[in-house]
């Protein structure tokens, strides 16, 4: 059951979300949009369903690790809207290779999206939140940040990094009334990424990502 929160709390809230074209990012975007928030979506693929369904959704096509383009997008948004109230980093990728088969390029690809991409969004948006003395940053973590997984050296390292980044940024931002949290989906969630990770047995119990959207709304 999805917990209902007062829609007035979210009306005209300005929310910046990465990875909005599918999975958790898409579901969380929809949850905010349904409650009247203005959502700025970032992804390198455009799922037009949100554009067609909600007038309060603004999509930007960009790879999260592209600092130059991300910087231009954030500057454009801040110039127009004056503030971003919530930052949610959902963009991520996963792949499996043994240490012998993990090339430097493979390592960089995982780290660049999952960790560097999260850092870039935080670097570009956190300063404006600190200046405005309010804000919420939510970074999507993983069980891989708690436990090592077979053939997941790059992915686990990227998610351990997200945890460390988030804890350090929390210490930096808390005196400015800016909150930094991570969310670790514990239940198997049905996403394009999880098709690679879950066995047929786990897929029998996996859940729609929309069901975890209240966790983001509460933060």
State where each predicted segment sits.
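C-terminal helical subdomain
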Residues: 175, 182, 200-219
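Conserved NAD(P)H cofactor-binding loop of Rossmann-fold oxidoreductase domains
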Residues: 90-95
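Alpha-helical segment proximal to the catalytic Tyr-Lys
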Residues: 127, 171-175
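Conserved glycine-rich cofactor-binding loop
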Residues: 21-22
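Residue(s) in the substrate-gating loop at a strand-loop-helix junction
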Residues: 142
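Substrate-binding pocket helix/loop in short-chain dehydrogenase/reductase
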Residues: 98-99, 106-108
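Active-site helix of classical SDR
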Residues: 122, 158
């Amino acid at each position: 059951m999805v917990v209902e929160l007062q829609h007035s709390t979210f009306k005209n809230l300005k929310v910046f979300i990465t990875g909005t074209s599918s999975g958790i990012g898409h579901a969380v975007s929809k949850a905010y949009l349904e409650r009247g928030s203005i959502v700025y979506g970032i992804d390198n693929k455009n799922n037009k369903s949100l554009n067609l369904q909600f007038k309060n959704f603004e999509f930007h096509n960009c790879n999260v690790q592209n600092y130059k383009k991300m910087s231009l997008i954030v500057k454009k948004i801040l110039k127009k809207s004056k503030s971003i109230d919530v930052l949610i980093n959902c963009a991520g990728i996963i792949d499996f290779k043994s240490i012998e088969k993990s090339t430097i390029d493979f390592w960089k690809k995982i780290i660049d999206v999952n960790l560097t991409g999260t850092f870039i969004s935080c670097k570009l948006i956190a300063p404006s939140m600190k200046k405005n003395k309010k804000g919420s940053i939510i970074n999507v973590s993983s069980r891989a940040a708690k436990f090592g997984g077979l053939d997941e050296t790059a992915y686990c390292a990227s998610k351990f990094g997200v945890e460390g980044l988030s804890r350090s940024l929390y210490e930096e931002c808390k005196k400015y009334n800016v909150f930094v949290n991570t969310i670790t989906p514990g239940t198997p969630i049905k996403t394009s990424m999880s098709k690679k990770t879950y066995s047929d047995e786990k897929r029998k119990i996996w859940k729609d990502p929309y069901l975890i959207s209240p966790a983001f709304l509460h933060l």
